Every structure is written in structure tokens, then in C-alpha cells.
Design a protein with these regions (language model features):
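Hydrophobic alpha-helix-in-membranes signature
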Residues: 26-28, 35, 60, 74, ...
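Walker A/P-loop NTP-binding motif
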Residues: 32-44, 55-70, 83-86, 90-95, ...
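Hydrophobic beta-strand scaffold positions of dinucleotide-using enzymes
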Residues: 31, 46, 126-129, 153
Length: 167
């Protein structure tokens, strides 16, 4: 089955327009495989090379599930490193804004205060590293009740470097 466009995959028109403005017009194989499954609410384990579009493969369906009118955490994306979390947030933030949603970037090694403010301001999407996310879960700054989508980006790397207990 060949998927010709993001529209064919059921991606919302405002997101498709944003992708097209970045010259992203055709889904990659990982996107064509994962997006329909994620839209259907299925759990997915995806594996593809760096640069294959994995972040968009989970971000586009995730954004369809976010209610921008609810000021509470609704999704959590975990990454093993600060650099990857920052990269993910840079992809998610502009698309989230189209859905009236905000992103809180939660990283160790920096002050808690701005992160707590972003969470209490109602960020719907949390992108972060396991250690700091766990700290903020334990202090109730991140409220897990409303989280409906969890993404483990580079889960194998998190487990390889000993983060399995935190995850």
C-alpha cells in the first residue's frame, strides 16, 4: 500500500500545511506505517534510522489527541539525553502551537523553577529526560492523571545506559 500524502494518513490540514511550508510533502516509510496505527490508538514500537522522520511519526498523531483548551499535561515524551529532548521539543513546539498547545521542556542540570512554571501554566506536552521528569512527578509538578500518550524515544538507549528503573 502506497501512501501519497499526509492527508491520506488522516493528518489534520493545519499540520499538513505546516509540513508543506517546510517542504515536507510525502510521508516517510516509518510515518506511513506508524501514523495510522497511532491514530487508531494502538501501541507502536517503531525502529528506523536517524533522519527517517520518527519524531513526526509519533508527533502528528499525538497532536491530534491533545486538547489545547485543557491546561494540564496530556502527553509525555521521554528521551535519554538533553540534546535529543531539545531536538524533539524543537520539532514539536511549532506544530503544537497550531493546535493551541504548549510544550514544557524538562531537563536535568538546569533550574527547576522555569520548568515548574511551564508545567503550572498548563503545558499539555511534556518533553524531557527520565531523571528530571521523575523528580517532577514525585513533587507533583507533573500530574500523571491526565497523561494519555507516552512516547519513549530511543528507549533502547535509555535501557542500555541504565535508565530502566526511572523509565
Amino acid at each position: 500500500m502506497t501512501i501519497a500524502s499526509f492527508t491520506d494518513l488522516g493528518v489534520h490540514t493545519d499540520l499538513v500545511a505546516s509540513l508543506e511550508s517546510q517542504s515536507i510533502t510525502e510521508p516517510t516509510p516509518i510515518q506511513a506505517e506508524c501514523i495510522p496505527l497511532l491514530h487508531a490508538g494502538r501501541d507502536v514500537v517503531g525502529q528506523a534510522r536517524t533522519g527517517s522522520g520518527k519524531t513526526l511519526a509519533y508527533t502528528l498523531p499525538l497532536l491530534e489527541r491533545i486538547d489545547g483548551k485543557q491546561d494540564r499535561q496530556q502527553s509525555l515524551i521521554l528521551a535519554p539525553t538533553r540534546e535529543l529532548a531539545e531536538q524533539i521539543a524543537s520539532v514539536v513546539q511549532p506544530l503544537a502551537a497550531l493546535r493551541n498547545a504548549t510544550v514544557a521542556l524538562i531537563l536535568g542540570g538546569v533550574s527547576y523553577d522555569p520548568q515548574r512554571r511551564a508545567l503550572s501554566a498548563g503545558a499539555q506536552i511534556v518533553v524531557g529526560t527520565p531523571g528530571r521528569v521523575l523528580d517532577l512527578l514525585e513533587s507533583n509538578s507533573i500530574v500523571a492523571d491526565g497523561i494519555r500518550v507516552v512516547v519513549l524515544d530511543e528507549a533502547d538507549q535509555m535501557f542500555d545506559i541504565g535508565m530502566a528503573p526511572q523509565v
